[in-house]
Amino acid sequence: MRVIPDIEYGEAGGQRLLLDACLPPSRKSSTSNAPDPAPRASIIMIHGGSWTRGDKADPEYRDVCTWLAKAGYPTFNVDYRMDPAFIFPAALEDVKSAVTWLRQPEQLGRFNLDPARIAALGGSAGGNLASLLGTTGSGPVTEGTRVSAVVDLSGPADLTGADAKPGFIPVQLAFLGCASEVDCPAARAASPIFAVSADDPPFFIANSTNELIPIEQSRRFADALRAAGVPTTFVSVTGGLHSVAMLGPSLRARILDFYASTVGVNSASPAPGAG
């Protein structure tokens, strides 16, 4: 497994947009006469930090990136523009740009990727953005901004303030560029729960029972997806752990099983649940 840091995937607002590529071990030696391996399923990974801080290289997110790579999935851990300098929809535009960048023929060949099998994973604010990829992605699955599966860990699904904890409302308003919840049209646009449709990809949603994001909000999101006919797994994690901190062995195994059933297991990858 190797990590290639700081690959530029675009530019916006005068800022270079960078990602780290966590790549599985090579399956073909330079002296091998074996045929090239089949194009692989991959994962776009989005860090958290209340949309205002955090980095792809933070240890807890680098750990998840390398875990997924060791499980056989090329994983692309993205940075994106954050508030207060950039408000919604800048961050969503950036992660969508990362998806379209990954589908460029140059990148598909460079990393040996299947354009129809790009999944997403995000934690906290990154879970919100990953879910928005799932509910607002557009175009053909081989060319546009759609993803084929979403893992959402403690992602805010409803930014209208309906059931947010009081201390988190100012965080949401800063991301949205609003002074109050009363007049904030961006709140619905940034809420994946209001963008659910029958053609959304399968979702895996996990939330702790007593954490920053109310579990009722995540459950409402899961219910909305199911009502639309979207295959959805909802996991309630006992305790107060938030986002990627929830990722113990059992939850990691379930996530790999989810990816195996949606985007598939790459050849020569560990069996589902490994890692």
Residue spans for each PLM region:
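Alpha/beta-hydrolase superfamily serine-hydrolase fold, recognizing
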Residues: M1-G275
